[in-house]
Amino acid sequence: MVNNTSNQPTSYPIFTVRWLAVHTLAVPTVFFVGAIAAMQFIQR
């Protein structure tokens, strides 16, 4: 997948502060949305 001879990332630094901020918000959000959606179908 890496076609360059150098190991420098050309224009895609993946692990950035933006990536960290997006994932610290997105991972619990997806978890809680799935948990709340599952709670809607629990019958007592």
Curated annotation (Swiss-Prot):
For binding heme, which residues are annotated in this chain's numbering? H23
Q: Does the keyword DNA damage apply?
A: no
> What's its membrane topology?
Single-pass membrane protein
Q: Which cofactor does it need?
A: heme b
UniProt keywords, alphabetically: Electron transport, Heme, Iron, Membrane, Metal-binding, Photosynthesis, Photosystem II, Thylakoid, Transmembrane, Transmembrane helix, Transport
InterPro entries in UniProt: PSII_cyt_b559_bsu, PSII_cyt_b559_CS, PSII_cyt_b559_N
Q: Where is it localised?
A: Cellular thylakoid membrane
Q: Where are the transmembrane segments?
A: 19-35
Enumerate the Gene Ontology biological process terms. photosynthetic electron transport chain
Q: Which GO terms describe its molecular function?
A: electron transfer activity; heme binding; iron ion binding
Stored Pfam families:
Cytochrom_B559
Could you tell me what the cofactor note in this record states?
Answer: With its partner (PsbE) binds heme. PSII binds additional chlorophylls, carotenoids and specific lipids.
User: Which cellular component terms (GO) are annotated to the entry?
Assistant: photosystem II reaction center; plasma membrane-derived thylakoid membrane
Q: Does the keyword Membrane apply?
A: yes
Q: How does it assemble?
A: Heterodimer of an alpha subunit and a beta subunit. PSII is composed of 1 copy each of membrane proteins PsbA, PsbB, PsbC, PsbD, PsbE, PsbF, PsbH, PsbI, PsbJ, PsbK, PsbL, PsbM, PsbT, PsbX, PsbY, PsbZ, Psb30/Ycf12, peripheral proteins PsbO, CyanoQ (PsbQ), PsbU, PsbV and a large number of cofactors. It forms dimeric complexes.
UniProt xrefs under HAMAP family: PSII_PsbF (MF_00643)
Q: Which family does it belong to?
A: Belongs to the PsbE/PsbF family.
Q: What does this protein do?
A: This b-type cytochrome is tightly associated with the reaction center of photosystem II (PSII). PSII is a light-driven water:plastoquinone oxidoreductase that uses light energy to abstract electrons from H(2)O, generating O(2) and a proton gradient subsequently used for ATP formation. It consists of a core antenna complex that captures photons, and an electron transfer chain that converts photonic excitation into a charge separation.
**UniProt protein name:** Cytochrome b559 subunit beta
Q: Which organism is it from?
A: Crocosphaera subtropica (strain ATCC 51142 / BH68) (Cyanothece sp. (strain ATCC 51142))
Q: Which gene encodes it?
A: psbF
